[in-house]
């Protein structure tokens, strides 16, 4: 799988911004991606060393439009820990 297909987008929230102090970065990833694939993709795209990958499956939320009910899509979240001294500049200033 192409690294750019595995990593969909960075997740920039207040909670994730606080994790950056501990060298942890959050991404939305492909639902079928494994931890080794996510690690390789991050290392290739951002030229950093990854020490740990934690993943979680996020369930879609119930949404309403008038009388109709539906769910947003389920997705997968990855929290990546980088080696000491490595940074991802994409997140700086967020």
Curated annotation (Swiss-Prot):
Report the GO molecular function annotations: rRNA binding; structural constituent of ribosome
Q: Which PROSITE patterns match?
A: RIBOSOMAL_L23 (PS00050)
A Gene Ontology cellular component where this protein is annotated is: ribonucleoprotein complex
Cysteines engaged in disulfide bonds, as pairs: none
Which Gene Ontology BP annotations are present? translation
UniProt entry keywords in alphabetical sequence: Ribonucleoprotein, Ribosomal protein, RNA-binding, rRNA-binding
Question: Quaternary structure per UniProt?
Answer: Part of the 50S ribosomal subunit. Contacts protein L29, and trigger factor when it is bound to the ribosome.
The family database entries (NCBIfam families) matched by this protein are listed as:
PRK05738.1-3 (NF004359), PRK05738.2-4 (NF004363), PRK05738.3-2 (NF004366)
By sequence similarity, the record places it as follows:
Belongs to the universal ribosomal protein uL23 family.
Which purpose does this protein serve, as stated in its record?
Answer: One of the early assembly proteins it binds 23S rRNA. One of the proteins that surrounds the polypeptide exit tunnel on the outside of the ribosome. Forms the main docking site for trigger factor binding to the ribosome.
Name of the molecule in the record: Large ribosomal subunit protein uL23
List the top taxonomic levels of the source. Bacteria, Bacillati, Chloroflexota, Chloroflexia, Chloroflexales
Give the encoding gene's name: rplW
């Amino acid at each position: 799988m192409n690294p750019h297909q595995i990593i969909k987008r960075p997740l920039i929230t207040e909670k994730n911004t606080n994790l950056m102090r501990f060298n942890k970065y959050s991404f939305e990833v492909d639902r079928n991606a494994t931890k080794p694939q996510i690690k390789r993709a991050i290392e290739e795209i951002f030229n950093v060393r990854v020490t740990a990958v934690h993943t979680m499956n996020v369930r879609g939320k119930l949404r309403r439009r008038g009388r109709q009910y539906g769910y947003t899509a389920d997705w997968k979240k990855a929290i990546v820990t980088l080696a000491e001294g490595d940074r991802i500049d994409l997140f700086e200033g967020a």
